[in-house]
Swiss-Prot record:
It comes from Seoul virus (strain R22). It holds the Pfam family Hanta_Gc_C. Keywords: Disulfide bond, Fusion of virus membrane with host endosomal membrane, Fusion of virus membrane with host membrane, Glycoprotein, Host endoplasmic reticulum, Host Golgi apparatus, Host membrane, Host mitochondrion, Host-virus interaction, Inhibition of host innate immune response by virus, Inhibition of host RLR pathway by virus, Inhibition of host TRAFs by virus, Membrane, Metal-binding, Phosphoprotein, Repeat, Signal, Transmembrane, Transmembrane helix, Viral attachment to host cell, Viral immunoevasion, Viral penetration into host cytoplasm, Virion, Virus entry into host cell, Zinc, Zinc-finger. Belongs to the hantavirus envelope glycoprotein family. The lineage of its organism: Viruses, Riboviria, Orthornavirae, Negarnaviricota, Polyploviricotina. The gene is GP. Residues 505-626, 1126-1134 are cytoplasmic. Residues 609-632 form the ITAM domain. GO terms for biological process: fusion of virus membrane with host endosome membrane; signal transduction; symbiont entry into host cell; symbiont-mediated suppression of host innate immune response; symbiont-mediated suppression of host TRAF-mediated signal transduction; virion attachment to host cell. Residues 17-484, 648-1105 are lumenal. This is Envelopment polyprotein.
């Protein structure tokens, strides 16, 4: 019993889950002005016609549904049926039946309903029906004010027996509509449509609802007649009203027709040309069969005397809406026609209707929202890192190969923020955001954990550990050197004697071992010499009885006396006088070394090792003089090592450099040449002083700057590439003559039809067809669910260029050179010898989203005679008609006895876009940065360095040192501001105010330096007057005072950067890190090291004197501890 109840409960839950469907509403994340609403819809599975007539939508959303939708609406229901007399097959073999039916919640919107729902914060939830004679497929629509996006994340709509979960998805768009992965903002002005070259064009899905409203301004049939150029009469007495539309699921209401709004004009044109709009096919219904009964007329409403509406009766899967409104009456006669296609063709004047709901694509002019760069930062969180990315506009794409990037979005005004977790920090974190590669140096995060521990230790004074603990947390040798320096200063007076004592104990241990080993080896050598002399003079030293080899003469005599008597010569124990017995006894005898020890006592040992051991014992490791000497010496050595280890972090990417030369180059050779290659993303700066080989005091400054590679492509904008679903419909007719009917899919943008006429037997006729040999079949192919997915550009020509500037003394020249081109001046020649590239003429660049995110290179893109499934199969060119693909497959009509014929198509049924997505990894991709584009040209830079340039620089020897040695340009420096941190991998940015006098333009470099080392440089072209220069550097220490330097001259004052590891760690853009600076400056030597150490000590004293007091207190404590543990020895008076 209970098991059956449990089973029933589980089955009921499974059925409930099966009947839950999603409706996703896309919301831009920034509020805009106007009555903006968002909308969505969802297709539901079929239910019986009787159940469909009883549907009532219910909502659990916190916005109440509009009251007017709960009222009962009356429609004229038109159904068809076979006549009782089926003797002959003709157009009169079936008939229609009209009646009145009531619905509650059907999409029959009232005038000002959407506007009122916006002001009153109410929702509009309704449904539409696509029906045949037996069942209906509901489509639920929802329109809500944009405020709902901020108030709710999801809610439920009930439409018995279905439940629809409404999910509000915040897009990265600020106010625009998400299409092709980009944010499009339509422009309603007609002038923008007339000047299409100045605006972008996008295909946007639009949903329109007919509003019946009487009035002279709502004569919609008159507008249709005027738009189509037909000559219909009595339009004033026909239906009146308008369509209210929501564009792209996110817009203020658009009213059609409206002559002053281009959006309304496009919507109205779409309704007239394709009145059925998109079909309502569910997945797997793209291949279906219709049985067409034929054309028939009906009376709307059923009480009128004459028939006033034409319809086409069918049986099969319903694909289009069954609701419409009669065009011939101004009273608003609504129609519900299950199993019938109403005549929506507006080219005829009578017996037609207007669609009640229309859904389709329209082409609109407008602009795309700008894509802003991302900022990424991370903080330490447990064993990993907690990161956050934010952008001023929105984030269209964010991925990371080492992080779990979730979609935890937060929005603040127009800014979008995404939080995610990185589980590992043992390697640098790489994040791709908005087409940019960001690198977070995790060694800074690892330092933070140690720093936090130290900061907790000094909880009573939080500022104390800043200047010292951060130096300890620097990875590598510098951190260990800092620790050794601090330990020596604070506890050296205790640790030095303790370490010395430990060393002495170890030395004495080894000295004792060496002494013992040496004495043993010396004694063995004496015994060997004694034995050799005895054997030379008297013979063998072996006992004749026991055959034992003796070491001394005394031992041999004892053997001769005892072995004869059967006694042991060592312990005098009785044993049998045989060789075997005595040898066995000697192995266990404890006194065999007796004669050896007696001889060892007579040998005098050497005193060398004894003197060494005694010296170690007498060493005065407790002496204050010794401790002071070692303490001072260690502090000096450790300070030098500490300063040497705090070198700058070079900003050098991976590149091949064959250049030869140093900071100062004497011009002995005929020419001075550099030859190297480096990535396209790198910027190169080369600076040297060229000296006169005759007079070293005469020199000329040479400064060469080569910008990163720019790629410019002349392109042809091919338009928009569409994804689509291919439908195969079989339409069979067996009532009356074989007529070529106008089916709803004939208004699709891309369709093709193959007709088969009369059959000669029952082989293909279903049993419900009256007569024999009657029937014709139409096989229709058409594309629906068109969706723009990408933007392709065909490359006409491509150019790779770099801007090269040369400052030679006073001479300043610049030129942009292409590959295999040279820049020649009087003294220098700079050439790009070759470029390794992956772009070529004729390639197609495909952008699947914002162009800032990069694209895909297609070597084979279809431009003419395209087949469905090829790349570029369904295209919407700009300012040209829609291009449909060809369908090269063959049709086959499959016949079985007494069944409806079925069309078969053996061609490809998968769109080109879906094929590309399935094999996208096989295509070559590229990234972009600093992209600028029009319909005719695209310019960008390669952020990945995938391309390489071979550069050759030749400097002539013919230099007039007499005239060029004097440079009149005067540069003044002042440090204005600093951001960032010292000593970290992220670095700092120093803002310098640089003044230039005596010359109009000067190309030079400004460095960020402290007293000892320069940590970064920026090549800049100065103009006369004040210039602002921002320099990025990495390195330094807590005492570094960063100044702006030009050559050997620096600003009078410097600025100190923040301590690292205290704030969040920001990501570094690859573009900011891809630069090579080479000025041949000498490396930091011993003098430089001492300056650096002194600067650090002075920085500690000036910046945080409490630290110095604490260090001195620790030093005093170690001295007291020394006096307790190692008191001074008192000398007794003689």
């Amino acid at each position: 019993m209970w098991s059956l109840l449990l089973l029933a409960a589980l089955v009921g839950q499974g059925f409930a889950l099966k009947n839950v469907f999603d409706m996703r509403i896309q919301c831009p994340h920034s509020a805009n002005f106007g009555e903006t609403s968002v909308s969505g819809y969802t297709e539901l599975p079929p239910l019986s016609l009787q159940e469909a007539e009883q549907l009532v939508p219910e909502s659990s959303c916190n916005m109440d549904n509009h009251q007017s939708l709960s009222t009962i609406n009356k429609l004229t229901k038109v159904v068809w049926r076979k006549k009782a007399n089926q003797e002959s097959a003709n157009q009169n073999s079936f008939e229609v039946v009209e009646s009145e039916v009531s619905f509650k919640g059907l999409c029959m919107l009232k005038h000002r309903m959407v506007e009122e729902s916006y002001r009153n914060r109410r929702s509009v939830i309704c449904y539409d029906l696509a029906c045949n004679s037996t069942f209906c497929k509901p489509t639920v629509y929802m329109i809500v004010p944009k405020h709902a996006c901020n108030m709710m994340k999801s809610c439920l709509i009930g439409l018995v027996p279905y439940r629809i979960q409404v999910v509000y998805e915040r897009t990265y768009c600020t106010t625009g509509i998400l299409t092709e992965g980009k944010c499009f903002v339509p422009d309603k002005a007609v002038v923008s449509a007339l000047k299409r070259g100045m605006y972008a064009i996008a295909s946007i899905e639009t949903i329109c609802f007919f509003i019946h409203q009487k009035g002279n301004t709502y004569k919609i049939v008159t507008a249709i007649t005027s738009a189509m150029g037909s000559k219909c009469n009595n339009t004033d007495t026909k239906v009146q009203g308008y369509y209210i539309c929501i564009i792209g699921g996110n817009s203020a209401p658009v009213y059609a027709p409206a002559g002053e709004d281009f959006r309304a004009m496009e919507v109205f044109s779409g309704i007239i040309t394709s009145p059925h709009g998109e079909d309502h096919d569910l997945p797997a219904e793209e291949i279906a069969t219709y049985q067409i009964s034929g054309q028939i007329e009906a009376k709307i409403p059923h009480t009128v005397s004459s028939k006033n509406l034409k319809l086409i009766a069918f049986a099969g899967i319903p694909s289009y809406s069954s609701t419409s409104i009669l065009a011939a009456s101004e009273d608003g006669r609504f129609i519900f026609s299950p199993g019938l296609f109403p005549n929506l063709n507006q080219s005829v004047c009578d017996n037609n209707a207007l669609p009640l709901i229309w859904r389709g694509l329209i082409d609109l002019t407008g602009y795309y929202e700008a894509v802003h760069p991302c900022n990424v930062f991370c903080v330490l969180s447990g064993p990993g890192a907690s990161c956050e990315a934010f952008s001023e506009g929105g984030i269209f794409n964010i991925t990371s190969p080492m992080c779990l990037v979730s979609k935890q979005n937060r929005f603040r005004a127009a800014e979008q923020q995404i939080s995610f977790i990185c589980q590992r920090v043992d390697m640098d974190i790489i994040v791709y955001c908005n087409g940019q590669k960001k690198t977070i140096l995790t060694k800074t995060l690892v330092m933070a954990s140690a720093f936090i521990l130290l900061q907790v230790s000094f909880h009573c004074y939080q500022g104390l550990p800043i200047a010292i603990a951060i130096e300890l947390c620097v990875p590598g040798f510098h951190g260990w050197a800092t620790a050794a320096l601090l330990i020596t200063f604070c506890f050296g007076w205790v640790l030095i004697p303790a370490c010395t004592l430990a060393i002495l104990l170890v030395l004495k241990f080894f000295a004792n071992i060496l002494h013992t080993s040496n004495q043993e080896n010396r004694f063995k050598a004496i015994l060997r010499k004694i034995k050799e002399e005895f054997e030379k003079t008297k013979g063998s030293m072996g006992c004749e009885i026991c055959k034992y080899e003796c070491e001394t003469l005394k031992e041999l005599k004892a053997h001769n006396l005892s072995c004869v008597q059967g006694e042991c010569p060592y312990c005098f124990t009785h044993c049998e006088p045989t060789e075997t017995a005595t040898q066995a006894h000697y192995k266990v005898c404890q006194a065999t070394h007796r004669f050896r020890e007696d001889l060892k006592k007579t040998v005098t040992p050497k005193k060398y090792w004894a003197r060494l051991y005694r010296t170690l014992n007498l060493f005065r490791y407790k002496s204050r003089c010794y401790i002071l000497t070692m303490w001072t010496l260690l502090l000096i050595i450790e300070s030098i090592l500490w300063a040497a280890s705090a070198a700058e972090i070079p900003l050098v990417p991976l590149w091949t450099d064959n250049a030869h030369g140093v900071g100062s180059v004497p011009m002995h050779r005929n020419t001075y040449e550099l030859d190297f290659s480096f990535p396209s993303s790198s910027k190169y700066t080369y600076k040297r002083h060229l000296t006169n080989p005759v007079n070293d005091q005469q020199s000329v400054s040479l400064h060469i700057e080569i910008e990163s590679q720019g790629i410019g492509a002349d392109v042809h904008h091919l338009g928009h590439w569409y994804d689509a679903r291919l439908n195969l419909k079989t339409s069979f007719h067996c009532y009356g003559a074989c007529t070529k009917y106008q089916y709803p899919w004939h208004t699709a943008k891309c369709h093709f039809e193959k007709d088969y006429e009369y059959e000669n037997s029952w082989a293909c006729n279903p049993p419900d067809c009256p007569g024999v040999g009657t029937g014709c079949t139409a096989c229709g192919l058409y594309l629906d669910q068109l969706k723009p997915v990408a933007t392709p550009f065909r490359i006409i020509s491509v150019r790779y260029s770099r801007k090269v500037c040369v400052q030679f003394g006073e001479e300043y020249l610049c030129k942009t050179i292409d590959m295999n081109d040279c820049f020649v001046t009087r003294h220098a020649k700079i050439c790009i010898i070759g470029t390794v590239s992956k772009f070529s003429q004729g390639d197609t660049l495909l952008f699947l989203g914002p162009m800032e995110g990069g694209g895909i290179i297609f070597k084979h893109w279809c431009t003419s005679t395209c087949h469905f499934g090829d790349p570029g199969d369904v295209m919407g060119p700009k300012d040209k008609p829609f291009i449909c693909p060809e369908f090269p497959g063959q049709f086959r009509k499959k016949c079985n006895f007494a069944t409806t014929p079925i069309c078969e198509y053996d061609g490809n049924i998968i769109s080109g876009y879906k094929k590309v997505l399935a094999t996208i990894d096989s295509f070559q991709s590229f990234n972009t940065s600093n992209i600028h584009f029009t319909d005719e040209r695209i310019e960008w830079r390669d952020p990945d360095g995938m391309l390489r340039d071979h550069i050759n620089i030749v400097i002539s020897k013919d230099i007039d040192f007499e005239n060029l040695a004097e440079n009149p340009c005067k540069v003044g420096l002042q440090a204005a501001n600093i951001e960032g941190a010292w000593g970290s991998g992220v670095g700092f940015t120093l803002t310098c105010q640089v003044s230039l006098t005596e010359c109009p333009t000067f190309l030079t470099s400004i460095k960020a330096c402290d007293m000892a080392i320069c940590y970064g440089a920026e090549s800049v072209t100065l103009s006369r007057g004040q210039n602002t220069v921002r320099i990025t550097g990495k390195g330094g220490h807590s005492g570094s005072s960063f100044k702006c330097c030009h050559g050997k001259e620096c600003s009078s004052t410097g600025l100190q950067a923040s301590a690292p590891h205290l704030d969040k760690v920001n990501g570094i853009s690859e573009l900011e890190n891809e630069k090579v600076y080479d000025d041949g400056a000498p490396e930091c030597g011993v003098t430089c090291w001492f300056k650096k150490s002194g600067e650090w000590v002075m920085g500690i004293i000036n910046g945080n004197w409490v630290v110095l007091i604490v260090l001195c207190v620790l030093l005093l404590f170690s001295l007291i501890l020394l006096s307790i543990l190692c008191p001074v020895r008192k000398h007794k008076k003689s």
